[in-house]
Curated annotation (Swiss-Prot):
Protein name in UniProt: Acyl-coenzyme A thioesterase MBLAC2
Recorded superkingdom: Eukaryota
Residues binding Zn(2+) 1, per UniProt: H83, H85, H170, D189
Note accompanying the cofactor annotation: Binds 2 Zn(2+) ions per subunit.
UniProt keyword Membrane, yes or no: yes
Mod. after translation: Palmitoylated on Cys-254 by ZDHHC20.
Disulfide pairings: none
Organism of this sequence: Homo sapiens
Function: Acyl-CoA thioesterases are a group of enzymes that catalyze the hydrolysis of acyl-CoAs to the free fatty acid and coenzyme A (CoASH), providing the potential to regulate intracellular levels of acyl-CoAs, free fatty acids and CoASH. Has an acyl-CoA thioesterase activity towards the long chain fatty acyl-CoA thioester palmitoyl-CoA (hexadecanoyl-CoA; C16:0-CoA). Displays a substrate preference for fatty acyl-CoAs with chain-lengths C12-C18. Possesses beta-lactamase activity, catalyzing the hydrolysis of penicillin G and nitrocefin.
Amino acid sequence: MSALEWYAHKSLGDGIFWIQERFYESGNRANIWLVRGSEQDVVIDTGLGLRSLPEYLYSSGLLQDREAKEDAARRPLLAVATHVHFDHSGGLYQFDRVAVHHAEAEALARGDNFETVTWLSDSEVVRTPSPGWRARQFRVQAVQPTLILQDGDVINLGDRQLTVMHMPGHSRGSICLHDKDRKILFSGDVVYDGSLIDWLPYSRISDYVGTCERLIELVDRGLVEKVLPGHFNTFGAERLFRLASNYISKAGICHKVSTFAMRSLASLALRVTNSRTSP
């Protein structure tokens, strides 16, 4: 199957494109975002990487400008992982320039498939990317990041800037990217319109509460109008406030006890199915 068949996209305007893997039918299917800039383009998360995402970006014309095709072809392209979980980081190995938060840089460099929580089944991939492919073959490949991110760093695209916000809780290196001028938040799995997951091996409820407090502050200060999440559909500031507030209100003793049990089971299952490093 070609890359052009595997992926699909739609434009949200203002140089932002929403890309998805068509034949990965799962709640884990991650949103891939392409953000065009005057001096640099950024891909936010890369999906599973079962087909070449860079090939799709070029073949579909997403990295070309009608007025200046040659300049666009030479424009730097940076792949940023909002975190290293498999559904977001699987395609990072296809890019020359890769950025990740420092808390998860070592796991990515090792190809640590326990920390990437690799969990994929044949039934979720409804059309195999190549003959004989099986989900048990899938691993997140080790990638040496070329850019280590910290809270407050700014990724300069020329005519727009993306500010890194370290937002742990879902994972220890989770980040959001904030386009302050346009009041857009690329949230990864920090927040999306669904049940927030805090029971994975490196999740931490206390961190998540602090992260949700930061999200509420963004809304209160009028700094976010639109959220482009790691899963499901986009939403606005009012929904962001409600999602963050609901998490904080539910993060009591009972939630912590049940989450501890779920984390223990998830960790056991992941250790059985994944080696610490990719082959």
